[in-house]
Regions:
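A short SAM/SAH-binding and catalytic strip from SAM-dependent methyltransferases
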Residues: 145-159
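Core SAM-dependent methyltransferase catalytic element
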Residues: 195-218
């Protein structure tokens, strides 16, 4: 499938799939979306001193890298990705420049260079395990404080936004765990509610009116 590098409205890059008319990050700003959806609406709400995070769709590593930049605590990060991006695509991402994070360049490069299926200590306070796995094969239980649900949109891959998948997400979270996603589709919200989540509609990132935050309240 054809893949192109696209510059989004905040100046940061994303990968565009023209055959699907879909992007890895919002055309209205890759970095803006990460901060709004995953950091400000997710990470900043977790009170634990050591935070376990599951990312559904590791992709370009942007959410992981910004989590590293913004975390004021110990992070245990698991990124799941069925189809990893290539080293050539990673090199074309301009996140370091736009974030003015030249001092952390080696961290971003290390996140992509480390092997899959093994836990690596990226820094003293940040560990990373990358799993090459289909989302429907996730079987974690009571393991995570926070899930970044960043799969391709329901228009393109509706099977990833089903009750079956969100039931797996519910099981994977600890009690009072949080799932955040850029999507606000009614069908997605209903699927979340059906498996037991408490769901909030929140103001969306640039270009989107709303987003969803789901909490596992027992």
């Amino acid at each position: 499938m054809k893949r192109e590098i696209l510059v989004t409205s905040d100046g940061s890059t994303t990968i565009h799939l023209p055959d699907l008319d879909e992007q890895y990050h919002s055309k209205n700003g890759s970095i803006n979306e990460t901060y709004h959806v995953f950091i400000n609406s997710g990470l900043k709400l977790v009170s634990a001193e050591k935070v376990s995070i599951l990312e559904i769709g590791f992709g370009t590593g942007l959410n992981c890298f910004i989590t590293y930049l913004e975390a004021k605590k110990v992070i245990d990060y698991v990124g799941v990705e069925a189809y990893p991006v290539t080293p050539e695509e990673v090199e074309k991402m301009n996140f370091i420049k736009v974030l003015k994070a030249e001092k952390e360049r080696t961290i971003f490069e290390k996140m992509h260079a480390v092997s899959w299926e093994e836990k690596h200590q990226i820094s003293e306070t940040f560990s990373l395990l990358k799993r090459k796995q289909l989302f429907e094969n996730i079987e974690d239980e009571d393991a995570f404080h926070l899930i970044y649900f960043d799969a391709f949109g329901a228009r393109v891959q509706p099977e990833l936004w089903s009750e079956e998948i969100f039931r797996k997400m519910f099981k994977a979270l600890k009690e009072n765990g949080i799932l955040v996603t850029y999507s606000a589709k009614g069908s997605v919200r209903r699927a979340m509610l059906a498996v037991g989540f408490t769901v909030e509609r929140l103001p969306g990132p640039p270009g989107k009116r709303e987003m969803l935050r789901a909490i596992k309240k027992l």
